[in-house]
Amino acid sequence: MANTKQPELKEPGPSDNQLIDYKKSNKTEQLTTGYGRPIGERSTVITVGPRGPLLLSDFPYIEDTQRFDRERIPERVVHAKGGGAFGVFEATDDISDICKAKVLKKGTKTRVLARFSTVAGESGSADTVRDPRGFAIKMYTEEGIWDLVANNTPIFFVRDPFLFQMFIHSQKRNPQTHLKDPNMVWDFFASNPQATHQFLFLYSDRGVPDGFRHMHGYGSHTFKMVNDKDEFVWVKFHFRTDQGIKNVEPERAKILAGEQPDCALADLYNAIAKKDYPSWTLYVQVATHEQVQKFSFNPFDLTKVFSQKEFPLRRVGKMTLNENPENYFTQIEQAAFSPAHMPPGIEASPDKMLQGRLFSYADTHLHRLGTNYLLIPVNNPETNKNVKVCTYQRDGAMQVGHNQNGCPNYYRNTFHGPEVTKPEKHLEHATFESGMAARHEANDDDNFSQPRVFYQKVLDDRGRAHLIQNIVEHLQQCTDKDIISRAVAVLANVDDDFGRQLATRLNVNLPKKH
């Protein structure tokens, strides 16, 4: 009997009626060229006679064609598919004992932009793939931009930035077939056991969150906070969803990927349009330098977490998203986030991955958006009216600002060019790391203790069963059986029973323990 199952129909929401709403609130304007000349006809080109050739003097046609040919900019090499919204962050609690940043002063309200995304897929990929989610926050503070470029996972796949490009290549398309290749994914994992913690998180139920509103966000890295006494602590940032965690079952995720591939974008847009504003509460875990020196692991290792029992969450404030973008391209696609953008009082740690990101994010913006990407309104720190950008940076393609007017373009000068006026308030906190410059590998690092806690104590029986099922379903797609054996051998280090169940279901032998 033929399968007569009908596709699942979604209820129309505000996103479906956007054009109707626009029509209700706008009148028809005179069509013009890009340089403002009114156009009298837009359906036909100028030709020599009704059947003759085109004329290059038909500038409205030429202009439209040239602009159309250049509409696309390079998509993000990672986090290409995403959606976002604006809102406000309010610092609700006093943390002045650990941080001097004005954005975190109790009672301060700051405009924010949030962009959520998948990682590996292209800009047209589905929202319900098993993939980490980007959770990037831009705060327009009175001390400049603060970009907290986070994910929905508290850890990552690698701890060294030299491996980042290799990891991303393994998640994307085979360079010859241009197809997603499970052999690449699992070969990388089996060759890099440091990815174990993140792989367990990814293949758990939280690997496919139900939209963007029902997931946490984590700064993941360890950051430094400095107070007005020049005392510092190490912190981890946690944005916890106030909507509660919700995930999508694997079979439903597959259906949505085919029938409603943009469901997460629509869910966020529609919730805000209906005034059902999503919010997240910001917490920090705080550790002193003396405490982290006693850790059994590197506190600046991105594959590790801080125990919440030993370092409980301390509330900082709340982010509420209450404004949809007016134009996706100008405000979301052109948004540029960089972990290097931090206000005084928040600084980087020696985390190798964070240090690598401090360079790479700004570099990719220069490629994708151009030299003056910070002049694009959504990225402009002068969005906060208390900020005045004064630099010795000049010119470059698309310099559409004041270009510092007639101010001297060299430092130092005696002509009232910008000067350091309060060095004690803006100097970075001293860094006291020292050692031999070399490629220090962490081959002896413990890659399995924290994944073991995640498997044995964080997950319940149902969660463990789902984790095993999800891994088996993807791993069995590998056509290289050696990769399957190697991957199971790595995962068996997490838990003996976990390894045995995987080996049995995938029909491989576990290596003997000595």
Predicted regions and their residues:
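Active-site-adjacent core segments of small-molecule enzymes
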Residues: 1-514
